[in-house]
Amino acid sequence: MTYVDVKGEVVSSGSEWIYSWYGIQAVSPSIIQKALNNANGQPITVRINSGGGDVFAGCEIYNMLKNHNGDVSIEIHGLCASIASVIAMAGKCKMSPLAEIMIHNVSTKAQGDYRDMEHTAEVLKKANKTISNAYTLKTGM
């Protein structure tokens, strides 16, 4: 059995190094891919305690887990918030009675004129619709 930790910030593979350099716990698609390669199609258990992070990195991790040839078990040990909750939808879930899951609309910070704000709003709406597919697939609702 291979254990994979999704702890700390979910970050892109390209920015993972800065978190590592500062000693800040983070997970990226490249970390998950290495673990999946090492699992070689065998069952894996993903242990989650994360407040979330980068939506696109999280979606990439979700897709990697869904495409894994072996069974994927999810254990939620603490906080499972934001994009981490989407990652949790990629396998069979068990949740500690002391754990929490938090789901919310996609958010960002933006600046610019009204055109920039309208564009940002459209990007957020599309991202909301995209990630809601993971919840729908998992729950059938």
Summary of predicted features, one role per range:
Residues 1-141:
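Terminal-region recognition feature
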